[in-house]
Structure formats: structure tokens, C-alpha cells
């Protein structure tokens, strides 16, 4: 009788271990996805803020501990898969002011970094920057 209860308990625990990662994965998604972002836009005659749809999130990647000339390095980045320009008028602009044309993401994907439209450089400790560790403030 004791062995039967023990086996039943083991089966229940195993079933819970199989279900838990699936459930956690649906609630804890930090992957590449569409995201609304508010940005400040200025021009001489008017200014304001607009909300656009862009891509944000983490991409699974592998970074080797050594550099090799035989293995190409490819960093996956969250970027637009499909996008279009949308015409945006700011509130408070005088009539007749030309609209802004803003790129708006329609879908996102983790893709190889394209240097023609994305900053793909790595941050190195030797690179002068204004990035400050919050713990040092």
C-alpha cells in the first residue's frame, strides 16, 4: 500500500514538473514582440509626443567565449519584420504644417543584425560612453 501511494505521488510530481514550465512560459514572455512606445517629437513650429508601435524584447543568442575566424558571429536582434511609414500630425501644430512620417512596426522577429538600419556594435569596457552603472550612483 505504501509503495502504491509513493508511486502515485511520484507521478503527480512528474506531471506538475511537466506542466509548470509551459504555464510559466506563457506568462513570462520577454521575447521579441510589438510594443507601444511614446516618443517626443520636435520641430521649429511645434512639438509634442506620439505613441508608435515598435519592436522590443530579448532574442535567444549564443556568444562564444573565444573569437574564431572560422565561425561567423551572428547576434540575433529584435527588429522589424514588416513595417510601413505612417503619417502623423502633432496636436498644436499650425495648419498647413507638413506631417511627420514615422516607421511603424507591423510584426517583429529575431533576425541577424542589419548594419544598414541598426546599430549592431557591442558595448565594450574600453568604449567611452555615458552609460553609468546604477549601483555606482
UniProtKB/Swiss-Prot annotation:
Role description: Involved in gametogenesis and steroidogenesis.
GO molecular function, one term: hormone activity
Quaternary assembly: Heterodimer of an alpha and a beta chain.
UniProt superkingdom: Eukaryota
GO biological process, one term: G protein-coupled receptor signaling pathway
UniProt-annotated glycosylation sites, renumbered to this chain: 36
Membrane-spanning segments: none
Main location: secreted
UniProt subcellular location: Secreted
Protein name per its UniProtKB record: Gonadotropin subunit beta-1
PROSITE patterns: GLYCO_HORMONE_BETA_1, GLYCO_HORMONE_BETA_2
Disulfide cross-links: 32-78, 46-93, 55-108, 59-110, 113-120
Gene Ontology CC: cytoplasm; extracellular space
Organism: Oncorhynchus keta (Chum salmon)
A UniProt-annotated Pfam family: Cys_knot
Family: Belongs to the glycoprotein hormones subunit beta family.
Signal peptide: 1-24
Amino acid at each position: 500500500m505504501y509503495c502504491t501511494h509513493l508511486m502515485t505521488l511520484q507521478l503527480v510530481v512528474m506531471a506538475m514538473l511537466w506542466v509548470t514550465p509551459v504555464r510559466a512560459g506563457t506568462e513570462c514572455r520577454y521575447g521579441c514582440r510589438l510594443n507601444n512606445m511614446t516618443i517626443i517629437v520636435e520641430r521649429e513650429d511645434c512639438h509634442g509626443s506620439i505613441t508608435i508601435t515598435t519592436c522590443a524584447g530579448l532574442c535567444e543568442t549564443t556568444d562564444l567565449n573565444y573569437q574564431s575566424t572560422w565561425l561567423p558571429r551572428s547576434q540575433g536582434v529584435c527588429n522589424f519584420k514588416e513595417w510601413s511609414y505612417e503619417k502623423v500630425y502633432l496636436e498644436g501644430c499650425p495648419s498647413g504644417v507638413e506631417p511627420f512620417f514615422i516607421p511603424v512596426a507591423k510584426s517583429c522577429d529575431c533576425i541577424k543584425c542589419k548594419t544598414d538600419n541598426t546599430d549592431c556594435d557591442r558595448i565594450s569596457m574600453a568604449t567611452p560612453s555615458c552609460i553609468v552603472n546604477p549601483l555606482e550612483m
